[in-house]
Every structure is written in C-alpha cells, then in structure tokens.
Amino acid sequence: MANPSGTTPLVVVNTTQSFEAACRALEAAIPAHGFGLLGIHDLGDTLRRKGVTFDEQCRIFEVCQPRQAARVLAADLSLNMALPCRLSVYTEAGATRIGMISPVAMLASLSSEPELQTVAAEVEATTRAIIDTAATPGDPA
C-alpha cells in the first residue's frame, strides 16, 4: 500500500479496476472484514448536481466497527467528531484509487491517550486490509 509522499496521513492504493468495479469491491470487502457500511456519498454526482464542474469520480464510504467506535468514545467522547471512518474510491488523471486518512495519524493529532493509539492501530490494520482486498481485481471479499 503506497502513500503518495511517504509522509502524508493519506493511505492511497491504485487499482487496475474501473471506478464502478472498485466501488463494488469495496462495498463487498467492508462486511467481509467485520465493519458495517453506514452510507455512501457520491461526491462527484453531488457537485455536478449543484452546478460545479467536476470531471472525476469520487464516492465516500462511511464505515464503522461498533466495538472499536465504543472504545474511542469511552476514552474521549469528543472524538465522536472523528467518526465514522471514511474510505474513498476516486479517479484521478485516468487512474482509479482507493484511500483513507490514516486512523493512527488522525487520532494521534487529536489525542495522546495510549488506549486511542491502540484502537487506531487495530482499526487501521483492518481498514488497510479492506482497501487491499478491494483493490485486488477478482479478489473475493
């Protein structure tokens, strides 16, 4: 799994799949790894409906693992604003990409609580596995 610059909190993987195929693969991989899909936002369509010129495709998948979310909230209720996790499928310059903001990096910027770093590392391991599964053509979730 690659980071564009190596220092960014963005986790981005390129896939050879089409945008629609990658979206279907991600949707299948989410429950296969124990997460729930809370919603899908088609950002590209929303922008175009609002009259904004946007030539790329972008869908945001809001996902959650309830037990992990409860651990975050038990440690610091104000971190509800960082939930749920968001995974994204998008196109850029002809490439299809699947990505997220690193849960470890995000929670580290918001709290130094050791329990939160443990939860973030566990969540990141699973969400990276979700992305890797979805990015692999023909990989059954």
Language-model-detected regions and their locations in the chain:
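Terminal, regulation- and interaction-focused segments at domain boundaries
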Residues: 2-33, 132, 140-141
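A generic structural signal for well-ordered coil/turn residues at beta-strand boundaries
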Residues: 7-9, 57, 83, 94
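Short glycine-/small-residue-rich flexible loop motifs, especially phosphate/cofactor-binding loops
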Residues: 27, 44, 128
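Short secondary-structure transition/capping segments
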Residues: 80-93, 131-140
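Beta-strand/loop substructures that line and gate deep hydrophobic ligand-binding cavities in soluble
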Residues: 86-113
